[in-house]
């Protein structure tokens, strides 16, 4: 997650946000809970030293709900403890909970509650002092996001490079201008990335969405101009 302590304190250089997540709670469906606020006295598995532990503390304390944290060294250990019923709930990023549910013995017996108790903007980070590499990562991320907005896909990128009259598409695909040179890349850097991986929506669907076992909705990770809109917004290439 892109936080102030990691950015300003630890010195990571974040190149953007590729997934807007939030912390939630995974519980057994048999508990018939409507909200995590009903977990009074419950054992909640969290990873030691993570944002998850602090966020869970804040959530329950602000609602005057007593809970019993079960603190494990790793997220995997917390998931396994939940699977063994050593705790009543498992709290982590919702994407991690969705992944954890797929490896439980009976995934359909577990539900992610609707509560979202934190903001977790996830994205690539690079070491400080390598501005050129940070620019490559940042603008490659923006290129695949912009490609989705402009209707450029893995399948049609080659045809659009030859046929499109839209100057935004032509700049993106390296037909007009030489924007890649600014980051030490070839003119076709964005075209090559899109051909290799697809646009942002295709990457999302394949790894997190309808084509993956997680089957997560786009939610906040929809394009800004979608209906309903999300927070994904590609910076202009010009």
Region annotations inferred by a language model:
Residues 20-77:
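Bilobed "Venus flytrap"/periplasmic-binding protein-like clamshell domains
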Residues 29-33, 37, 42-43, 48-51, ...:
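Extended ligand-binding regions for polar small-molecule ligands
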Residues 1-38, 94-118, 233-236:
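Acidic, polar ligand-binding/catalytic clefts
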Residues 9-13, 37-38, 58, 75-91, ...:
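Short helices/loops that flank or line small-molecule/ion binding pockets
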Residues 175-238:
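C-terminal functional modules
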Residues 53-54, 80, 98-99:
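Alpha-helical elements of the RecA-like P-loop NTPase motor core of helicases
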